[in-house]
């Protein structure tokens, strides 16, 4: 896409957004790869899986939302793949346990479960 007769990717702010996304996705890939190794050797815990589901799906949601924003109004039109990705991906933070449920499980594992006294 172009704005002011130049590709939007050449604007400093947009380069910074894309650099952030690229870095965060690389870090997420390393994290997921380490967890795949644990799955393969049977040592992945429920809490590690919860942390991964929460972090990676929320990252994906931020990245897709940012890409939609970079596309401007076109990003909201279903003719563009980013709009379809935005619609399809939204389920990822809900299905299989919402982000809030993942955080609840992690918090309980940290010993922060509520206990009735008395």
Where do the model's predicted regions map?
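Alpha-helical interface subdomain recognition
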Residues: 1-118
